[in-house]
Structures are given as structure tokens and as C-alpha cells.
Swiss-Prot record:
List of catalytic residues: 58
UniProt-annotated binding residues for [4Fe-4S] cluster: 56, 75, 77, 86
Descriptive protein name: Ferredoxin-thioredoxin reductase, catalytic chain
Induction of synthesis: Dependent on photosynthetic conditions. Expression declines about 80-90% in the darkness. Re-illumination up-regulates the expression to normal levels. In the presence of glucose, expression is down-regulated by about 20%.
Biological source species: Synechocystis sp. (strain ATCC 27184 / PCC 6803 / Kazusa)
EC number: 1.8.7.2
Keywords from the UniProt entry: 4Fe-4S, Disulfide bond, Electron transport, Iron, Iron-sulfur, Metal-binding, Oxidoreductase, Redox-active center, Transport
Subunit-structure text: Heterodimer of subunit A (variable subunit) and subunit B (catalytic subunit). Heterodimeric FTR forms a complex with ferredoxin and thioredoxin.
GO molecular function: 4 iron, 4 sulfur cluster binding; electron transfer activity; ferredoxin-thioredoxin reductase activity; metal ion binding; oxidoreductase activity, acting on iron-sulfur proteins as donors
UniProt key word Ribonucleoprotein: no
Pfam families the record matches: FeThRed_B
Cross-referenced InterPro entries: FTR_bsu, FTR_bsu_Cyanobacter, FTR_bsu_sf
Disulfide bonds: 58-88
Amino acid sequence: MTSSDTQNNKTLAAMKNFAEQYAKRTDTYFCSDLSVTAVVIEGLARHKEELGSPLCPCRHYEDKEAEVKNTFWNCPCVPMRERKECHCMLFLTPDNDFAGDAQDIPMETLEEVKASMA
């Protein structure tokens, strides 16, 4: 394992911890298909490493660096903080048809999805 891999795993673990704690704090849940959750957390970790901030990975940006500075789409984004609306389906309210009952995700699930994306 290279030092880059170690850093990637630390960032992925940090984003996992953030997502789990935020879901519990806001009474939201992960998608019933945890692979959706894993892809979003992996995207947040990648943006955290590349841009220094967990920019929403589910949107298209003309200028990611400008978006990071703007902070509107940094996770948790403004729509999530204000209205519990998560475009990525990472944080779902209990009444959402796609909401599961999990507020935790196994690290193995994240690693499997990350490996399948490589």
C-alpha cells in the first residue's frame, strides 16, 4: 500500500464517519441500496482530496474550485441544511421511498464499491 493509498483510505474513513454522524444528527437515513451511499461517499472523499472540500459529487460544475469557494454545494449543501433535500440521495428523510433503515455503512461496502470503480 502506498502513502497515497493510505491517505485515500483515511479520507474515505473520514467521509464515512461524517456521513454516519450527520445522518444520526439530522434523523436521516442512507439509501436502501447501500451501493448508492458508497458511491456518493467515495465521490465526497475524492473531492476532499482533490479540492480540499467535500463538494457534492452528484452535480456538474464548470469550475469546481469556484464552487468550493462559494460553499453552496459543499456537503452538507445548503438545500440539505435548510430543507433536508439531498440531491445525491445520501441523506434521506424517513418518508422518502428510497430511504433504508441504516445510518451506518460497513467500510467493506465502501472498499468494494471503490474497487469496482477503479
